[in-house]
Structures are given as C-alpha cells and as structure tokens.
C-alpha cells in the first residue's frame, strides 16, 4: 500500500487524542487540496502534530520503520525500497516526497494494515525522526553541499548524524565510499557497509575525523594523519551487478537511467536483506519502477518529446549531465531560488556547466539571469526563454532534456501537464 494521507484509517491502538489529531490533519489536508494548494500532506501533518506532539511516535509504534536519508537519491531509493519490501508485506511510505516531520506524520497516518514504514527523511531532521520512530533500519547514502543557507555545512551535518545516531538500535546501512557518511555511521553499533560509489568528491577531501587531507588511491580512501579509512564493504556495486556478502553477483535491470540509480539499487538490496528479502527478489521488484515523482518521465510538449530531470545541487547536476543525450541534443535549464530550493545561488559556480558546450541550451526560471551569467563564463551558447513552450518552439530536432532544481521542476511538471 502506497502512501496517501487519506489512504487508510488510523490504527485502532491510537489514543483518543491521537485519533482526533489524525482526523483533524486529514480534514486540513483535504481543504488544502480542494483549494488547489498541493497535496495537503504538510499542512495536515502540522495540524495533527499541534494537537498531539507525540503523534509521530504513536503512528510508528506498530510498524517496522526504515529511514532513508541523503543529499541526493533519497526519494528514488525510498521508492525502490518500498517496492522491494512489498515482497514481505504491505508498505506505507511518504511517496509524495514530504520528508520533514509534518509530511512524515501525514504519511504514517495512512498506515492502515501496513507492516513497513519506508520513510524518506530530510538530512537536517534525521536524528529527531529516528528518535520518534524507533526505526529497525536506517539507510545513509551520501552527503554533499546543498542549500547551505538552510542546512549546515556538510561536515557539521555529518557530525549531527554521528551524535544523533550514536545510540540507535537500528541496523545502519551506510555508503562506505563516502567518508562523511562513513564517519557519521561509525558511531553506530550495527553497520552494514555498502560500496555504492561516490561520483562527486569535492566535499570529501578533508578528513571529517581530524581535518587532515584525504588520500584517494583508486576506490580506497584514507587519512594519513589519523588513520581513518574506508571500511571493508559487505555489499558492493560492480558494473551493473550487486555483489552480496557471499560474493554472489545479482544483475540490476532498472528502467531508471544512470549510475546513481545503480547505486540506489545496491543500497536498497542491502536494506531489504535486513528484512529477509532475497537480493534477486528485491532487484526484480525494482524493475517495475519507471519514474519517481516525475523524475525521468518523458512527456510531449507541442508534439516534441521532453524528458524531465531533477538536479538540486552540484553533485546532482554532475550526475544528471551523464544522463543527457549527446550533443547537439537540446537542453532546457530552469533554476529557482525559493525557500525550498535555497535562496543562495552561489552553488551555480560549483557546477561544471562546461559539459554543455555543443548543446543548444535554453535558460528559464526565476534565476535565469544568474544561470545565464554562469553559462556565459563557461562558454556555453544559450538562449533565455520565458516558458518550456517557447524553448520547444526554438529547439532543433531531437529529444529535449529539461533539467530543473526543486521548485522549478514542480513548476515545469505543472506547465507540461496543463
């Protein structure tokens, strides 16, 4: 069972106060949807938590909760994991992507007869949500710079994870290829290490333990100053195979593109195994996932195929550039700087836009002029437009790759569906 805030009745084991809070939250969510103000999951959760601050803890009591957190890939991994765990029982998940306490509360309010709660968690809120939900497993995928005006610097965030998770009884499934994640998870009692890769390394050259300069020969990494080093992984991504702890390779056949999703699938298989789901079964179930909240979806705009891609930070843009069709495929870039995106756009200068040289590029969004300056410096030929329809009309033949950050992506989805 997937997660919609109204999808099922609350558990009969809830207190009268908790039941009232759930009912009021669902009513608020319904009003929000009727007013055209989105899914209502956030406002519904806020109302419910105002009435019962302990509601999240109550809703999680009868679930095997799995938390997924990362800078990039957490929504997709949550979707893949929910599908994999359905092999072992019903699942409730915050599929609408609201990953802070209010949205998570709304999702779990629709748990019905679910056995598993598969929950995506914003990095900043991980320790608090872990405290409230008593998870059986926690997946830590990666950490890199993102919304520094809202979130902490990456090492500070890793330190919050390390301190907040140090006493957890959960099994922690952590990416051994990310030094920040490894350092954060090293304080936990039960850790399964996964060699899931790390394409973007610009935030991982300073040792999180002592501040020394990291050495990264081949796939290994270590700090010569303090001895902090990559742990021996239990699971590994090798090519297009997941290698389990026994050394058995299992093929990954996703419909989702790119190496990042092979990495997500590897972590998912490791998490699913904690609950007795065989890697082959988990990977086969992941094959059914075609798109995630609009990501990777292809749509027709005025008769032209447009593929929708989300990129929110330097690491995400780097990964997305590996997915797009080769030049001269047309590319649309859209960037906003609303609160959900982070209002500081200086991160644009950390993205290697030189990779777009040779592509016809069309720039739109609230901060299109900021992006235009960055592309000018990168030597990329571009045209500023006001809408996706205008870009489509001017684009040369070929599939159009549309890359947008968070709120620009949501606006783009609305525009192509209208």
Feature annotation, model-predicted:
Residues 271-311:
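Gly/charged, well-structured mid-domain segments that form the phosphate/adenylate-handling core
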Residues 199-200, 292, 310-384, 418:
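Active-site beta-alpha connecting loops in nucleotide-dependent enzymes
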Residues 133-142, 220-230, 256-287:
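A conserved, hydrophobic alpha-helical segment in the catalytic core
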Residues 126, 179-183, 339-344, 367-373, ...:
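Short, charged/polar "capping" segments at the starts of alpha-helices
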Residues 115-117, 168-172, 304-306, 355-362:
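Short active-site oxyanion
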Residues 390-418:
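A glycine-rich beta-strand to alpha-helix segment
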Residues 6-193, 201, 205-206:
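Phosphate-binding loop of NTP-binding sites
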Residues 195-243, 252-255:
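Cys/His-rich short segments
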